[in-house]
Amino acid sequence: GFVFLSGLLTGMVYSRKMMKDGYSVGRDKIWSRALELYRYAMAIVLIILALQLVLPGAIAAWKNWLGDASLLDPSSLAPIATFLVQPTFMDILPQYIVYMIFAPAVIWLCIRGHWLGVAIGSLLVWLAAQLGLHRIVTYPLDAWLAGAPDEEGLRVSFNLLGWQIVFFAGIIAGTLTSMKKIEWQKVFDPKRTTLAWTALAVALFFLPLRIATAHGFMPGFVLEKFGLMEIRADFGPVYLINFAAVAYGMAWILIAGPRHENAVIRKIASTLTSLFTFNFLQLLGRHSLQIYVWHVLIVYAVYYVDARTPELSQLTKTAITIGALAVLALPALWRDREKIFANAPYVGNWMKTPA
């Protein structure tokens, strides 16, 4: 969902820029954003690696997540800087950065009316990922990086060729929306419910299967076949079909739901709209990049504490989880401090930035 929304916003924002100021201006804006993401991606890696040197036992605690990466071994940093090795929980930004590099050309093609060609190309690239064609490149690269059979080579969590279909679907939708080529009120007509019911049926079909695979209820001989279709790293067919069903269903509820004659559907639409417009969630959304970087620090800190202490009770784990969630919004609160606390007694003047 977040990958699609990122593509949607990218398409909406930068297509307007291209239509107003030209391709090169829009391209430079997108690449500038990609460079900003790269700086954040490298900053969080360097911060964690610095903490690894000063915290007792951090090397052992984070070994499975960081591998052999160390500030004391500069050669281990080059694969990270080129995204060939991505430490655990630091693999989202590299994915976005790569997509942003190609985004200007994709947006421009959509503006020029070639959105269908873009969609077909994206689908073919996704199919290539499902068939493993990317291994023609990744397997030799992995062997070269490892240098030895027992050493770690290429380390990535997401198949870029598989997940791109979600991002660029968002790009297409966002660009066409900015060009006023799509009238969403007509696309999601409350009187046209066939696709909405189909989406619900598909989601309900996969729900028990998801529970069965998550809790080990699915027989091995079934899982052997089903698992090939449910590879998250490749955004396999199960994920693509589920995403399409849920995305369509949510969009129908949010756009067509408020106009539907059924009071229950209108109530569901109202509830979801209230949830998505909740001020706290909007606050987090405005500063999602900083929240992401901060959340990586929190996760590594919690994992370090867990590794350095005896077995924690369920109550303690719950308290740690609540505490981690409580501090998650700190970067957003700090960046919006003037807006939030400007008129607050005692702290209002302190929060204001000097002119």
Tell where the protein language model's regions lie, with residue ranges:
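Alpha-helical transmembrane segments and their immediate juxtamembrane cytosolic regions
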Residues: G1-A355
